[in-house]
């Protein structure tokens, strides 16, 4: 299920990136013995007022032109939480988004 989450995050990052844009993926172990995996894009970003809502079932950011069901991030969060982890977002309009999955090592 964790592989599905990473695939979903990567797919989203590619779809929300500008043409010929790039996506960064990475992972590292933290000092407090967690593994953090992240997927970062450099697309239009997500308005901070939607940072919590994007993880709700069927939620789509208003004005989004990219096709989708509004389920991918909510299912991803559910899978990560089932492994006692967290899935968060860091994003600014015009600067892209970084989704961070944090799991106990």
Where on the chain are the PLM-derived regions?
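Short beta-strand/loop element within the Bergerat-fold HATPase_c
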Residues: 20-33
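Acidic ATP/Mg2+-coordinating residue in the GHKL
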Residues: 41
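Short alpha-helical Gxxx[C/S/T] motif in the catalytic ATP-binding
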Residues: 72, 76
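Short helix N-cap motif at coil->helix boundaries in the Bergerat
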Residues: 45-53
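Glycine-rich ATP-lid/hinge loop adjacent to the conserved G-boxes
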Residues: 59-68
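Short helix-loop "hinge" at the ATP-lid/N-box region of the Bergerat-fold HATPase_c
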Residues: 13-14
């Amino acid at each position: 299920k964790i592989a599905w989450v990473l695939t979903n995050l990567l797919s989203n990052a590619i779809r929300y990136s500008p043409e010929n844009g790039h996506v960064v993926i990475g992972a590292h172990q933290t000092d407090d013995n967690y593994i953090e995996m992240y997927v970062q894009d450099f697309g239009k970003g997500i308005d901070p007022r939607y940072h919590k809502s994007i993880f709700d079932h069927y939620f789509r950011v208003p004005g989004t032109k990219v096709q989708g069901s509004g389920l991918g991030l909510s299912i991803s969060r559910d899978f990560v939480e089932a492994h006692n982890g967290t899935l968060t977002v860091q994003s600014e309009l015009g600067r892209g988004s970084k989704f961070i999955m944090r799991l106990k090592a």
